[in-house]
Amino acid sequence: MAENYDRASELKAFDEMKIGVKGLVDAGVTKVPRIFHNPHVNVANPKPTSTVVMIPTIDLGGVFESTVVRESVVAKVKDAMEKFGFFQAINHGVPLDVMEKMINGIRRFHDQDPEVRKMFYTRDKTKKLKYHSNADLYESPAASWRDTLSCVMAPDVPKAQDLPEVCGEIMLEYSKEVMKLAELMFEILSEALGLSPNHLKEMDCAKGLWMLCHCFPPCPEPNRTFGGAQHTDRSFLTILLNDNNGGLQVLYDGYWIDVPPNPEALIFNVGDFLQLISNDKFVSMEHRILANGGEEPRISVACFFVHTFTSPSSRVYGPIKELLSELNPPKYRDTTSESSNHYVARKPNGNSSLDHLRI
């Protein structure tokens, strides 16, 4: 049968339907189409672990009121970002009702009639608002079982009338809240690096916000595909909002760690650009999203904090000079920050997306 498989034609046919994976599921598909088959799907861990390893949960409450509390939080964030590149945060300042409304708003968008969703379907990279299935559909070796509504929310804030009616208002409200939280976290990360609180903000690390609103429909064969294949994020920092269905795993010491859902938490992770400018002090860890084996669509919202989406950008990034010494020389060459670099960076064959910049 392999000789009769025309992958390019099947990708094109799927894309031109403009209904996404959700459209396939709603139509009653009972088998995962071959374009989604991923030979690397292996939910089992490659080796046993003798200890239970968990991504830490950090309470951010009180960081503005108490120097002692702030110093404690900085120390915990430093440890988490050096060891795991991930942590969950509670008491982060984003109202829980705003988080819930955001999840519900994105669920409403993906639950709309396919003919309504089609109006937003595009692969035009010049558009700030896009809906499609798999940004890298034609480039990746296997498509993932998900659909995405994405929008550039900063530095140029979109107008409400340019966003989908069913979720535009909450997208704007949530982005305001998460931008405030990111400013706080970049202060904490700066202090964790031994720098002044405003250092990373003054490098424009919190300037750009790219919001990816994912829907992971139920998968009839979750052992054949991923919701998101193994990758790192080409951001400075990513803040992730999940519903209660889980699915996120982080690779630590060769072992896949589940990140259990917590309705009150937001997940923070280091992106490749933060690893670069911190000169490997903070680590951008590989992670993946398992296909949804449940009965209801899984929803998540990933906020990527990047420099800018104006292309090309002349801003140059390299290891922060204040972190360097004779004993800690730069590990990366300087690079310009281009909008295309902020797309998800895959690591085929275990090669880091930063390898081409490593000295």
From Swiss-Prot:
GO terms for cellular component: cytosol; plasmodesma; vacuole. Binds 1 Fe(2+) ion per subunit. Residues 207-308 form the Fe2OG dioxygenase domain. Residues 329-359 are annotated as: Disordered. Pfam families: 2OG-FeII_Oxy (PF03171), DIOX_N (PF14226). SUPFAM superfamilies: Clavaminate synthase-like (SSF51197). Signal peptide: none annotated. Gene3D superfamilies: B-lactam Antibiotic, Isopenicillin N Synthase, Chain. Its cofactor is Fe(2+). Residues 349-359 have a biased composition (Polar residues). Disruption phenotype: Plants exhibit a complete absence of 2-hydroxybut-3-enyl glucosinolate accumulation and a decreased resistance to generalist herbivory. Keywords: Dioxygenase, Iron, Metal-binding, Oxidoreductase. Necessary for the hydroxylation of but-3-enyl glucosinolate to 2-hydroxybut-3-enyl glucosinolate, which is toxic to insects, bacteria and nematodes, inhibits seed germination and produces bitter flavors. This is Probable 2-oxoacid dependent dioxygenase. The gene is GSL-OH.
